[in-house]
Each structure stands twice: as structure tokens, then as C-alpha cells.
Amino acid sequence: VLGCSKTPQTELNQAKQQAAEQVSKTAKSGLEQLQEKQARTKVEEGRAYTGKAEVALYIHTFHKLPGNFITKREAERLGWKHKGTLNEVAPGKSIGGDRYGNYEGLLPQKSGRSWKECDIDYKTGNRNAKRLVYSNDGLIYYTDDHYKSFEKLY
């Protein structure tokens, strides 16, 4: 059309470009927020932690879980049932240190790599869907939807 500086196709392409830039900015700001929180987070060896940032940093720094985590087998020995509340048999403890199979292949695979998992933000009652999954070679991922999606932390 003469006299028009923009065609509908040009406007569509510009809208797509703007949307892509916004997604990129949002992803970047999310990553920047995570990095800023990691920089502010401090952990001490031997202390108990249950939050995402603190437990991830503890694993990253000390290459082990904080001492307030026990495996499912250890919890069962104390009388815990998988659908029951851990706090009744092990006050102050969280489940962690058990093998994670990565059967769906959502996490990066590499020869010799193995994964373990731990609960995040457990206080009392039944376990929630939040987990950290960490590898024997330093990778740490977070899921808040019981392994359907992951966010890389380290």
C-alpha cells in the first residue's frame, strides 16, 4: 500500500521481536536475581538449613548435605511412613541423600554421573513437591513441581 510506512507483516515481525526481547530480559532478570541472592547467602558448616538457596550453597560449598537431613531408610528406622509426617519421628529433620534416577532424562547425563535428592522447605506434615537434585560432579538443580521441571542453581 502506497503511503504507508509499515505493512502488517512488518508490524507482526516487530511485535515478535519485542516479545522475544521481553522474554530474554525476563529470563536475564530471573538469573540476575538468583545470582544476587546466592551472593548474599551465607552458610556455616554444621548448621541446619532447609531453604533452597541455603541448602544449594551448602552442597556447593561443603559437597554434602547439612546435618539435619536423613535418608528415607534412616527415617523408616525411626518409624516414619512414606505418607506420614517426618516431624513426628524425627523433629527438625528433612529427607535427603537418597538416589535420584533421572529416568526421564530431564537432567544432563554423563558417564559416571549420579544424582541424589533432598527435600526443600520441609517443616511439618507431609512432604511437599520442592526438591534439590544434585550430582556427584557438582551440578545442583531445583524443582518445585516434583521433578516435572528444573532450574539450574550451580
Regions found by a protein language model. Name each.
Residues 4-8:
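Bacterial signal peptide processing site
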Residues 73-154:
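Functional cores of ribonucleases/endoribonucleases
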Residues 65-66, 79:
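Active-site-proximal polar cores
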Residues 14-64:
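N-terminal low-complexity, Pro/Thr/Ser-rich intrinsically disordered segments
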Residues 24, 67, 103-104:
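Short charge-dense sequence patches
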Residues 11:
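Winged-helix/helix-turn-helix nucleic-acid-interaction surface
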